[in-house]
Amino acid sequence: MNQIEQKWQHIWQEEKAFEVSNASSKPKYYVLEMLPYPSGKIHVGHVRNYSIGDVIARFMTMQGFNVLHPMGWDAFGLPAENAAIKNNSHPKKWTYSNIENMKKQLKSMGFSYDWSREINSCDPEYYKHEQKFFLELYERNLAYQKESLVNWDPVDNTVLANEQVVDGRGWRSGAIVAKRYLKQWFLKITDYAEELLNEIQNLKEWPEAVRSMQEKWIGKSIGANFHFKIKDNEETTIEVFSTKPETIFGASFIGIAFNHPIIERLVSKTPEILAFITKCSHITGSSELEKAEKEGVFTGLFVIHPFDSNIVLPVIITNFVLMDYGTGAIFGCPANDERDHELAVKMNLSIKQVIKADMDVQKTAYTEDGILVNSDFLNGLTSNEAKQEVIGEFEKLGIGKRSVNYRLKDWGISRQRFWGCPIPIIHCETCGIVPVPYKDLPVTLPDDVNFDGHGNPLDHHPSWKHVDCPKCDKPAVRETDTFDTFFESSWYFTRYCNSNAIEMTDKKACDYWLPVDKYIGGIEHAVMHLLYARFFTKVMNEQKYVSVREPFKGLFTQGMVLHATYKDEHNNWLYPEEVVKKGNEFFHKESNNRVVQGRIEKMSKSKKNLIDLETMQEQYGADAIRLFVLSDSPPEKDLEWSASGIEGCSRFINKLEYMFKAIDSLKDDVNSEINKELNRLVHFTIKLVAEDIKHFALNRAIARMRELSNAISAEISKDKIDVKTVRHGFNVLVQLLNPFIPHITEEIWQKLGNKKRLYNSSFPAFDESMLELDTYIMAVQVNGKLRDTYEFKTSVSEDEIKQVTVSLPKVQKFLEGKEPKKIILVPRKIVNILV
């Protein structure tokens, strides 16, 4: 099989089979899988994503579209730098070596990529454009620097976005993340929050789960901002944001973030307060915040209720209020908020009912809307009426106003690492922040770098770091932070339209290809990459780089490939090939020591539950691997790797060769009886497989093609064979299978005597008239209960159906010689005889 696969890969390369023009008269179709990080090797878990995209690309080509199906490399990132530290070599060397190896692997799988458009994000010819784009954002005040409390990963020595903190730990290193103040660069994605939110409803071809995740991440809240005066210091106020200002008469405390500015100004830092602040600083993300037990510590401050000066509320530092949401302060209404209720019970604060409820709010918070009670001038109003009324009062008193808040925060793009795109900024003591002039771009990374594992090597590289200011020529220093790697992947899809464009994009090419018709990748990118790419596209539109404002028309999120995990007696992870099964137990191949089989999980390097691609290719071939990862489960669902599954796919491919040989040896028999059922199945299969592929039901399409192959095999084994239909059916089968298993089908297609390659042939057409059945089966009921079935010819009349079904023995038994009261017909489905 490997010889056949290599033969066709060579032919495709020589014929430039998958290189496409930007000036075709055909309708365009742009299919794209999320570009990979060049980690070194592709395992079979990655193959599924690329196989899905390849089926769609090949199918749409056969449908007559000009298909763009490119590939490139998201090549900056921490693993390369970590490898550089480990091996004392430049990350560039490690990265380019990995790219070479992975490109070879992708080609060996027969994927139909247009390699002439390949991009590499660590190539200065690529990132010089994003450096210029950043400067354009800076000129528009969409990029800025500020001191910010950041998530600091002490192992990777870098800043992490909130999305990159999972359960308080760094998403790559697993280290406990701490809070630290650093000067950081930000992009004003919040300026686009409303459009990003509103446009979600137009993304009709995106999974509902992803749309919902983006809506929640943007997190629009409508409410009010208003001020509480501090008791005994009424010149000073605390501003709060609330989505339920109407519950103001149920307030029992003010909750503030651990880093609220009022703490520095007015709070005496007792050991208890200092310890609590330190504890809060380790809470890094909203997911961890939601899981944490609600706690607080009293500051010693009180505020005065805005509508009743006799009511004072304690100011409490809490672990569930964040400085970067709203104002960093809330008023707590325990009767109507679960978090406030939990804290009130713990700290023995008052719980006052302000919305009518058929429950005891002393025990549980009532979180629904309703009629206001115990609320002075708001009594008797609905929640919405009361909200409008109380905001009006805030505005009259000059202490507050209606406001909108977003959970979405500006995107922190600074990373304190070497292997990333340098931020093109120079810091001058005289001139301040100075953009690198366009003519001096790209700012490239130095080659002579010392990797000792401590911080950012750019900070310790004097000849790179120290430069003259472009404005005043005085000594200055370069910005040593590099871009978050999501910067590169937020615009790469535009570069594929013409990867040799002199500017960031070729506008004409982008107008032809964009938006991407189908984008394929993991759901884990729903609130980072996909949101950032949408944001970049909107800004690129305003900068006249593209005409679209949304990058991806359709999105498909594939399931993961899973495999069992294994550990030895020392709790070390083992590769599957190191384990052998004896009976119902597992043992180490070499030591013969007992091995524990763990959970079936996503394939990952860390847990070693990977299946090596090259080993599988040598054993089964690329086509068998492609077929297996698509056939055993719907593409959007997870797939468990199984040896029996891949073996079954290999047998099916071998069967195709046997079928070809058998059919090739058949002699035409003009007297053979036509197999109408087989002919009908051929046309039905063409129709249904096309529909399945369009709906990404690839496993169902494969099942239909297996059914057709079985029917053809059954016909071949008969004494009298309908040779013409068999040959036609087999030709169709080979065409239908081509997007899934391109190597063997091209080989058989050629042997069948076809001159045109399958990769640029048309998808087979079906004859609508052939789909009509000669007969159909009806269920025969008596008084609504099934008593029999009967096969009728399609030409039968209603009267004939009634006569036949009434005379059936199983029906006569219930009629007992009487005439039916009524006969109800559901055409071609049911006849119901009422007795």
Swiss-Prot record:
GO terms for cellular component: cytoplasm. PROSITE patterns: AA_TRNA_LIGASE_I. GO terms for biological process: leucyl-tRNA aminoacylation. Its EC number is 6.1.1.4. It holds the Pfam family tRNA-synt_1g. Its main location: cytoplasm. GO terms for molecular function: aminoacyl-tRNA deacylase activity; ATP binding; leucine-tRNA ligase activity. CDD domains: Anticodon_Ia_Leu_BEm, LeuRS_core. Keywords: Aminoacyl-tRNA synthetase, ATP-binding, Cytoplasm, Ligase, Nucleotide-binding, Protein biosynthesis. A motif ('HIGH' region) lies at residues 36-46. InterPro entries: aa-tRNA-synth_I_CS (IPR001412), aa-tRNA-synth_Ia (IPR002300), Leu-tRNA-ligase (IPR002302), Leu_tRNA-synth_edit (IPR025709), M/V/L/I-tRNA-synth_anticd-bd (IPR013155), Methionyl/Leucyl_tRNA_Synth (IPR015413), Rossmann-like_a/b/a_fold (IPR014729), tRNAsynth_Ia_anticodon-bd (IPR009080). It is an enzyme of class 6 (ligase). The keyword ATP-binding applies. It catalyses: tRNA(Leu) + L-leucine + ATP = L-leucyl-tRNA(Leu) + AMP + diphosphate. ATP binds at K605. Transmembrane segments: none annotated. Gene3D superfamilies: 2.20.28.290, 3.10.20.590, HUPs, Isoleucyl-tRNA Synthetase, Domain 1. HAMAP family: Leu_tRNA_synth_B. Belongs to the class-I aminoacyl-tRNA synthetase family. This is Leucine--tRNA ligase.
